């Protein structure tokens, strides 16, 4: 009897330990294993508070350190922070313990596109839909300076609504890695989907390599088999290098023409993303999407726990994830309570704003942004930004002293224009408002600033032109450009 009681207590203790361990960082309940690799395992998990299903990539920190792959992990985090798009698997947050690194990501329930294609070729309309979503996502990545370099059906997932999601940015590269010749030189990718210039090992354009892979994927969707296939890998490479493929007889003429240009062996003659998106076959039924571009610096989070150590060595920073739901949509509502006080600027902030110690650097022309100093109340500045947004039919999102203006113009591969404004306290009587482009086309941003933003904010100066005591060297309102 005593032995039985001891066994029951032992089992109960193990169950309690298991339940405690299953709640990762006090937030996520770990579920079944979804997949694994050399350094990481991916689990299905559930947010204990919201009930939302997520996928958690658990990376063994010791293995990563021993293999010298810290830079690789940092780059993957940086890339996932850059590419938030409806057709890309989303990174929610990054956390760490002393032994593990956790990527909390969107859980895509439908599985790999590969499994769908393995059953046979797709109908033209279905293939077109997936291809449109793929091009939309990849072109956005290119605009953000990210090149996937390993696009294939196995890395394309389908959600419960049948929408495509690009995943696995582990082999991706960013513009910063381009050498002095303007090209990448790392040999990577999956043999059947790799571009001929990668095989040549002479340097390659990351965008053109992705376009080649997208062409192979389109062929596979329509045909049910690969355009370049041979049991002998070297023989397959020769076919790729020569561009030796034939389209099946059931391919429409428009697809034949598109594939010939996408699978052009000479990169300089290969179609670009705009070329693809301008073809009549691509444009048929293409649904332009609206999405929210987050500030790059708001995507990493390190949980605060006794068992947690900083991921500073991995992510380079720690900050809270800011989801669109945290912002208040533009419908005239305000949160309860008074207007929040802006964050104060200290001497170090001012120096970081300026190229030198001379504060006149605050007001110099130097890039895609603007700052102005104003004596107007915070509420009045925000109201003016809302008024400008109403005039041009932009959506406004607000959180404390941050305002996001989001355009709705569709059709640009760079996404809709998105602008962030943040208010800082300079003195008790003065504030600095920093305005920056978060997403969209630079020419559209410049036009918006010159025609809408600057003139209407200058009007604020005349409405609040009273001089603030002790501010003779700083006008009550001065608009200028900066980084």
Curated annotation (Swiss-Prot):
Its cofactor is Mn(2+). The active site is at 150 (proton acceptor). GO terms for molecular function: ATP binding; protein serine kinase activity; protein serine/threonine kinase activity. It catalyses: L-seryl-[protein] + ATP = O-phospho-L-seryl-[protein] + ADP + H(+); L-threonyl-[protein] + ATP = O-phospho-L-threonyl-[protein] + ADP + H(+). It comes from the Eukaryota. It holds the Pfam family NAF. It is an enzyme of class 2 (transferase). Residues 313-338, 459-483 are annotated as: Disordered. Residues 367-396 are annotated as: PPI. The modification Phosphothreonine is found at residue 186. Residues 168-197 are annotated as: Activation loop. Keywords: ATP-binding, Kinase, Manganese, Nucleotide-binding, Phosphoprotein, Serine/threonine-protein kinase, Transferase. GO terms for biological process: signal transduction. Transmembrane segments: none annotated. Residues 313-322 have a biased composition (Polar residues). ATP binds at residues 34-42, 57. Belongs to the protein kinase superfamily. CAMK Ser/Thr protein kinase family. SNF1 subfamily. The activation loop within the kinase domain is the target of phosphorylation/activation by upstream protein kinases. The PPI motif mediates the interaction with the ABI (abscisic acid-insensitive) phosphatases. CIPK serine-threonine protein kinases interact with CBL proteins. Binding of a CBL protein to the regulatory NAF domain of CIPK protein lead to the activation of the kinase in a calcium-dependent manner. This is CBL-interacting serine/threonine-protein kinase 19. The lineage of its organism: Eukaryota, Viridiplantae, Streptophyta, Embryophyta, Tracheophyta.
């Amino acid at each position: 009897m005593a032995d039985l009681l001891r066994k029951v207590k032992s089992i109960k203790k193990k169950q309690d330990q298991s339940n405690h361990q299953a709640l990762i960082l006090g937030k996520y309940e770990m579920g079944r294993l979804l997949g694994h690799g050399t350094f990481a395992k991916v689990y299905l998990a559930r947010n204990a508070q919201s009930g939302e299903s997520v996928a958690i990539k658990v990376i063994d920190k010791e293995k990563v350190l021993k293999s010298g792959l810290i830079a690789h992990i940092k780059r993957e985090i940086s890339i996932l922070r850059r590419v938030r798009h409806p057709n890309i698997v989303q990174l929610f947050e990054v956390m760490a313990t002393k032994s593990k690194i956790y990527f909390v990501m969107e859980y895509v329930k439908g599985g790999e596109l590969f499994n769908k294609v393995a059953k046979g070729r797709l109908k033209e309309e279905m293939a077109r839909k997936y291809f449109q979503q793929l091009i939309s996502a990849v072109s956005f990545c290119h605009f953000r300076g990210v090149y996937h370099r390993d696009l294939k059906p196995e890395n394309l997932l389908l959600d419960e609504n049948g929408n495509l999601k690009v995943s696995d940015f582990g082999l991706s590269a960013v513009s910063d890695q381009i050498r002095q010749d303007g090209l990448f030189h790392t040999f990577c990718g999956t043999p059947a989907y790799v571009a001929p210039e990668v095989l040549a090992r002479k340097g390659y354009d990351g965008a053109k390599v992705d376009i080649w892979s997208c062409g192979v994927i389109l062929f596979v969707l329509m045909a049910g088999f690969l355009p370049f296939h041979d049991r002998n890998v070297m023989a397959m490479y020769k076919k790729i290098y020569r561009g030796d493929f034939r389209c099946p007889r059931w391919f429409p003429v428009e697809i034949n023409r598109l594939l010939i240009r996408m699978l052009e062996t000479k990169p300089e003659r290969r179609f670009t993303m705009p070329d693809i998106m301008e073809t009549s076959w691509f444009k048929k039924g293409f649904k332009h999407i609206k999405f929210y571009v987050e500030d790059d610096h708001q995507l990493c989070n390190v949980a605060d726990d006794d068992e947690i150590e900083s991921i500073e060595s991995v992510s380079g920073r720690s900050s809270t994830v800011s989801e669109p739901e945290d912002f208040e949509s533009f419908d005239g509502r305000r949160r309860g309570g008074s207007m929040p006080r802006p964050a104060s600027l200290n001497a170090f902030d001012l120096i970081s704003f300026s190229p030198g110690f001379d504060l006149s650097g605050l007001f110099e022309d130097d890039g895609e942004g603007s700052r102005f100093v104003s004596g107007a109340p915070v509420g009045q500045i925000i109201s003016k930004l809302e008024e400008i947004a109403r005039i041009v039919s932009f959506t406004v999102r607000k959180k404390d002293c941050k305002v996001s203006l989001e355009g709705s113009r569709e059709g640009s591969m760079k996404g809709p224009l998105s602008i962030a404004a943040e208010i800082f306290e300079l003195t008790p009587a003065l504030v600095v408002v920093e305005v920056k482009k978060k997403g969209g086309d630079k020419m559209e941003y410049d036009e918006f600033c010159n025609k809408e933003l600057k003139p209407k904010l200058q009007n604020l100066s005349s409405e609040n032109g009273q001089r603030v005591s002790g501010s003779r060297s700083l006008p009550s309102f001065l608009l200028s450009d900066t980084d």
